[in-house]
Swiss-Prot record:
One of its GO terms (cellular component) is cytoplasm. This is Gamma-glutamyl phosphate reductase. InterPro entries: Ald_DH/histidinol_DH, Ald_DH_C, Ald_DH_N, Aldehyde_DH_dom, G-glutamylP_reductase_CS, Glu-5-SA_DH, GPR_dom. Belongs to the gamma-glutamyl phosphate reductase family. GO terms for biological process: L-proline biosynthetic process. PANTHER family: DELTA-1-PYRROLINE-5-CARBOXYLATE SYNTHASE, GLUTAMATE SEMIALDEHYDE DEHYDROGENASE. It catalyses: L-glutamate 5-semialdehyde + phosphate + NADP(+) = L-glutamyl 5-phosphate + NADPH + H(+).
Length: 428
């Protein structure tokens, strides 16, 4: 492992003297190599999916594992977008001159060697490499075994592209397989002095393991127990449109909505129509009603008053803290905005929270009082994504408050240093 770390550290030094044009050219070459190997990538992904289903892997993990022509095109597009973005390295964040003539500049520099530990998400392989390379970092990619078939051609294409562009091939590496299960992960987490930062991407168990076991700095990407509050002043059609997008478009995403909070004044019309909309995905989910509802007493009564009971269940105490990542949703009727805010404060994972309202004062209050990385008024939580935010890609969505918060693009992979120029000044 130490030899791997040494090669990565040497790669950082080589990247430091690469021009922005050279790095951008390498990204475009990798894009072209991925495009050339797209059939191999999709065949390999099909092997991963077959193995995952045979092993009984949880549905959300299978969904995150899947690649398609459309997703591959998104990956290629993100490489193009990143290659066109301004290089953050060397940017002067601030600069000033002291009374004694010292010129001080605070400039942006790479973190150094970063490790990304992630589960069954082959797209992370490409995104993490691209963001790290563009921002002058070397990256150690520790992927979950569920995506091993998919990652092989992805990594092969990355290396082919870098070689063709005369790039820094050693800037991306994978850890060697150790005899002890998760031994490589434990080694990475203890690699103080070798690894500058670790980014975990995955479920609660993975993130907890990394955070609790790390001796190196961790930039945490948190789970998403995201809420949608439908205010009494909401345009119901807008609320329904957002609910459908935020829950059904990609339930396995961390930015999908997991809890519906509905003002009592609009609960009946909203919930009845949500029930109808969610039922349209029955063919996909192969369950009655399409989506399972876990309800407080009031919403249970409303959702069952027209006879539907097979997919409506009573909520338990732990319901409100569940990240389903599936065609399931928690529902609660609230008397006012205050109770919605209290519920969110108790159960939010500080990822993405949404209010649908036509009342500007309530919208402003929601913006101010909700403690989350992304707070939305009249828009879907599904926008919490580096690509959607115009970053090209993301290393993850940070729910912590130090260093970075929200979707993390190029700048989240940088830190700063001070450059001081003088003419012989000494401190009096």
């Amino acid at each position: 492992m130490v030899e791997v770390y040494a090669r990565l550290r040497a790669a950082v030094a080589r990247l430091a003297v690469c021009s922005a044009a050279e790095k951008d050219g390498a990204l475009r070459a990798v894009r072209d190599a991925l495009h050339a190997q797209r059939e191999d990538i999709l065949r390999a992904n099909a092997q991963d999916l077959a193995r995952a289903r045979e092993a009984g892997l949880a549905a959300p993990l299978v969904a995150r594992l899947a690649l398609s022509e459309h997703l591959l095109e998104d990956m290629l597009r993100s490489l193009t977008v990143l290659s066109l973005q301004r290089d953050p390295i060397g940017e002067i964040i601030e600069g000033y001159t002291l009374a004694n003539g010292l010129e001080i500049r605070k400039v942006r520099v790479p973190l150094g060697v970063v490790a990304v530990i992630y589960e069954s998400r082959p797209n992370v392989t490409v995104d993490a490499f691209a963001l790290a390379y563009k921002s002058g970092n070397a990256v150690l990619l520790r992927a979950g075994s569920a995506a091993s078939y998919s990652n092989a051609p992805l990594l092969r294409a990355i290396h082919v592209g870098l070689k063709k562009a005369h790039g820094v091939v050693d800037a991306v590496a994978v850890p060697p397989v150790l005899e002890e299960k998760y031994g490589d992960v434990d080694h990475i987490l203890r690699a103080r002095g070798f690894i500058d930062a670790v980014f975990p991407r995955g479920g609660a168990a993975l993130i907890r393991r990394v955070v609790e076991g790390a001796h190196v700095p961790v930039i945490e990407t948190g789970c998403g127990v995201c809420h949608l509050y439908v205010d009494e002043s909401a345009n119901i059609d807008v609320a329904l449109q957002i609910a459908e997008n935020a829950k059904l478009q990609k339930p396995a995403a961390c930015n999908s909505v997991e809890t519906l909070l509905v003002h009592r004044a609009v609960a009946r019309p909203f919930l009845h129509r949500v029930q109808e909309i969610f039922a349209t995905c029955e063919e996909t989910t192969r369950k009655p009603g399409g989506v399972d509802f876990f309800c407080d007493a009031e919403s249970f009564s409303l959702l069952t008053e027209r006879g539907a009971r097979k997919n409506v269940f009573h909520a338990q105490a732990e319901t409100w803290d569940r990240e389903y990542l599936d065609y399931q949703v928690s529902v609660r009727v609230v008397p006012n905005l205050e109770e919605a805010l209290r519920h969110i404060a108790r159960h939010s994972t500080k990822h993405s929270e949404v209010i649908v309202t036509r009342d500007r004062a309530r919208a402003r209050r929601f913006h101010q009082e909700v403690d989350a990385a992304c707070v939305y008024v009249n828009a879907s939580s599904r926008f919490t994504d580096g690509g959607q935010f115009g970053m090209g890609a993301e290393i993850g969505v940070s729910t912590q408050k130090l260093h970075a918060r929200g979707p993390m693009g190029l700048c989240a992979l940088t830190t700063s240093k001070y450059l001081i120029d003088g003419e012989g000044q000494v401190r009096p």
